[in-house]
Each structure stands twice: as structure tokens, then as C-alpha cells.
């Protein structure tokens, strides 16, 4: 339960009043809105605790969008509720039973028919508590804010509560990510608690892709060895495979077996096993593969797609390969939403990088002005210097 926040540490002005609403209105449906880093997932788990405290035999289920988010949520469940069902939306479609409590995260990603089906699977006195942020809608089939209000019959049958404080992000990260937030005005008006105000956002410039890959691996490994459990966010799986291949080349290890890619399906379990057996402290997280628990216990670097990173957070986040020809997604609106998601995954350090002369158009003047710009070659020399880097596992900035 490393990321779970006990009730004694919740905010008394927003978070605790929401939980009081939940407790005072049994059977009432809720939609909890909040920007990235506002604590929505933590509050959903507290809703489960409230329900179980009142009725230990209550039949509850948690419904999520990605397997990586399931892995994180399971890690936050108290031991006594570890057997609570936690499923993806796709798995939930095949359930033919009703529940006293259905907790749903990332409602903005659901198509209309899924939202209606979820609402239909409560018991007579049961309810659904949704959480989500329209600004993080990253799928073509997503439902609009108005459509969600219509389905939930707000305000007659459901109550909307909005969180207006941001706990995870620094002011710097909020400023650069605001460029890609649909509700920019309210996002910029939200109160940032800013526990990491002095941590810089870095932009690393490499001469070429080979140097960028070498820097990315050496630097992320340095963070991993120091206990930061860093994540590398990459937009697509093809680029992930190319980076893993580069890491194996850098470490002089056997390359990937392309038989592990069957009919377009990448066998990431075999790739993770190959990395582990060759002593490479790197794992792919997503599609049921990889684990947060293993990342923390073994000081692994985690590599994950933008899509799979939604709902997650990491102490240190790398977003590499932001050169002019890097494709985040075919549809520009969704590409911007995905970039917003990626930028808001870091709770402490955010490190962007690109190679060559031209940067990605998403690296705007505003973003660049907020970054500390460094050269990949200089950073590689620093890492190779035995007097540089991180020492004694201290919680310090290493960039």
C-alpha cells in the first residue's frame, strides 16, 4: 500500500467532505471529477473502505481501463480487502451478476454503452461511484461530458463533486502541461500544493538517436539504482521494441527473438524474461506484463506506453524521442491529450529529450522556457565519472 494515503492525511477541505457525502448518502451515485494528481484513485479506495465498514458482506467491484492501473490499484488495497474483484471494462462486460458497489475510474474513456451497462449492474440499493477527468480522454470512442451527465441523470440520480487541488504535480509541470489541457482556464486556476517546487524539468538534447538511447538507458538506470523506480513513457510499442533492442546492444547482450512477435502480438512476457535473465534491470509494464511490486523490489526501470500510463504516477518520468518526426498518435486531438497524460505522470522529476536539430512541435516555446536544457554527451560523461551521480541512496536531484 505504498501509494495509499490514510484518512488521517487526507485534505479536510475537499477530500474528507467528499467521503462524508459518500457516507451520508447511501445508494446515491456519484461522479468524482478532478485534474491529474488530485487524488481521485485514493478516494475511490476510501469509498470501498467506507462501504465495507458499514456492511462487511457488501459485494463490491472495481472497474478500470488498463491492466497497469489494475496492478497499481491492487497494490493499494488493504490486506483484508485484497480479494476484492478488480477488472478491466472488457472483463466486466462478461459479468452476469449485480453488485452493491461498483467503483469506476477513468469514466471519460468509456463509450456510452459501457456506462449504461455498468449502471444496470447494481443491486436494488446498490450504487456506482465514478471518477474521471475529461481532459484525459484518449480514445476515439470516449463519451463527452454532456453525454455522461445525460446517462447518469445528473443531478436527479447522481451527484457531481469536483476536486480543485492538485497534489502530485509541481507548478512547473502544471504550467507546461497546461498547453495541452482542454479546460486550461480551470486547470491553471486549480491550487497546486507544490511539494516539489524546486525540482527542475529537464530537456536533454542529443546529437543523434543512438546517443539519445545511450543517454536514456544510462540515466534511467542511474535513477533506478538510486531507488527512484523511474518510468520511460513511449507513445507506441514499435518504438519500445527499438529502444529495448538498443539497450541490449549497449549492454552487449543477445538481441530479441523475433519469433516473440506473433501475428502482430508482442510477447512481452518473453521479452521481460529475456531482460531479467541477462541482468538488464528493465521491464515492460502493460497488457498483464510487468509489475509495480517487482519494479520497487528490484529497482527496475519501467517502460510503458502513453496509453497504459494513464492513472499512474512515478517519482521520475522520462519522455524521450521528442524529435520533429516522432508520431504520438494519428489524430491530433488525441495526440495532445496523450501528451498531456504523459506530462502529468511525474510526482517529482520530469525529463524530456530529443535528438537532432528539430524538436517535436509539441515542445512549445513555453515548455522550453520552463526547462533546464542539457546536452546528452555531457550527461553521459557525468554518469561515467565515478565522482558524479547519486550516492548513498539519498533522495536528491541527480540531473
Regions found by a protein language model. Name each.
Residues 31-70, 163-165, 178-276, 285-286:
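Conserved RecA-like ASCE P-loop NTPase motor core of nucleic-acid helicases/translocases
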Residues 60-100:
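Inter-Walker segment of RecA-like/P-loop motor cores
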Residues 3-9, 136-140, 150-196:
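Conserved coupling/interface region of RecA-like P-loop/ASCE motor cores
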Residues 98-114, 128-130, 135-139:
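SF2 helicase catalytic motif II
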Residues 38, 83, 88-96, 101, ...:
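Core RecA-like ATPase module of SF1/SF2 helicases and allied nucleic-acid translocases
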Residues 112-126, 145-151:
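Short, conserved "post-DEAD/DEAH" coupling segment immediately C-terminal to helicase motif II
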Residues 126-133, 162, 351-352:
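Structural recognition of the conserved hydrophobic beta-strand(s) that form the central parallel beta-sheet
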Residues 1-28, 114:
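N-terminal pre-P-loop "Q-motif" helix
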Amino acid at each position: 500500500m505504498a501509494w495509499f494515503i490514510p484518512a488521517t492525511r487526507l485534505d479536510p477541505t475537499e477530500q474528507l467532505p467528499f467521503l462524508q457525502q459518500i457516507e451520508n448518502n447511501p445508494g446515491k451515485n456519484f461522479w468524482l471529477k478532478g485534474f491529474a494528481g488530485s487524488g481521485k484513485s485514493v478516494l475511490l479506495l476510501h469509498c470501498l473502505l467506507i462501504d465495507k465498514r458499514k456492511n462487511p458482506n457488501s459485494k463490491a467491484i472495481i472497474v478500470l481501463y488498463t491492466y497497469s492501473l489494475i496492478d497499481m490499484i491492487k497494490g493499494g488495497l488493504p490486506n483484508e480487502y485484497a480479494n476484492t474483484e478488480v477488472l478491466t471494462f472488457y472483463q466486466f462486460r462478461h459479468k452476469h451478476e449485480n453488485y452493491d458497489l461498483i467503483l469506476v475510474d477513468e469514466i471519460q474513456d468509456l463509450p456510452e454503452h459501457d456506462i449504461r451497462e455498468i449502471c444496470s449492474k447494481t443491486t436494488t440499493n446498490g450504487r456506482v461511484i465514478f471518477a474521471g477527468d475529461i481532459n484525459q480522454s484518449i480514445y476515439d470512442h470516449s463519451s463527452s461530458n454532456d453525454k455522461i451527465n445525460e446517462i447518469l441523470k445528473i443531478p436527479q440520480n447522481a451527484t457531481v463533486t469536483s476536486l480543485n487541488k492538485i497534489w502530485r504535480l509541481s507548478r512547473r509541470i502544471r504550467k507546461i502541461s497546461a498547453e495541452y489541457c482542454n479546460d486550461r482556464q480551470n486547470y491553471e486556476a486549480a491550487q497546486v500544493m507544490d511539494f516539489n517546487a524546486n525540482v527542475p524539468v529537464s530537456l536533454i538534447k542529443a546529437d543523434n538517436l543512438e546517443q539519445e538511447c545511450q543517454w536514456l538507458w544510462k540515466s534511467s538506470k542511474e535513477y533506478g539504482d538510486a531507488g527512484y523506480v523511474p518510468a520511460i513513457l513511449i507513445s507506441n510499442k514499435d518504438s519500445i521494441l527499438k529502444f529495448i533492442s538498443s539497450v541490449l546492444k549497449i549492454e552487449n547482450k543477445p538481441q530479441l527473438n523475433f519469433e516473440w512477435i506473433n501475428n502482430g502480438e508482442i510477447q512481452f512476457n518473453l521479452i521481460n524474461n529475456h531482460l531479467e535473465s541477462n541482468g538488464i534491470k528493465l521491464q515492460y509494464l502493460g497488457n498483464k506484463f510487468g509489475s509495480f511490486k517487482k519494479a520497487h523490489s528490484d529497482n527496475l526501470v519501467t517502460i510503458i506506453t502513453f496509453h497504459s500510463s494513464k492513472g499512474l504516477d512515478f517519482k521520475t518520468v522520462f519522455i524521450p524521442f521528442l524529435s520533429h518526426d516522432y508520431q504520438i498518435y494519428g489524430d491530433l486531438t488525441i495526440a495532445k491529450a496523450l501528451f498531456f497524460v504523459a506530462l502529468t505522470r511525474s510526482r517529482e522529476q520530469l525529463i524530456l529529450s530529443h535528438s537532432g536539430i528539430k524538436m517535436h512541435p509539441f515542445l512549445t516555446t513555453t515548455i522550453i522556457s520552463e526547462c533546464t536544457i542539457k546536452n546528452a554527451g555531457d550527461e553521459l560523461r557525468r554518469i561515467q565519472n565515478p565522482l558524479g551521480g547519486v550516492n548513498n541512496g539519498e533522495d536528491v536531484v541527480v540531473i
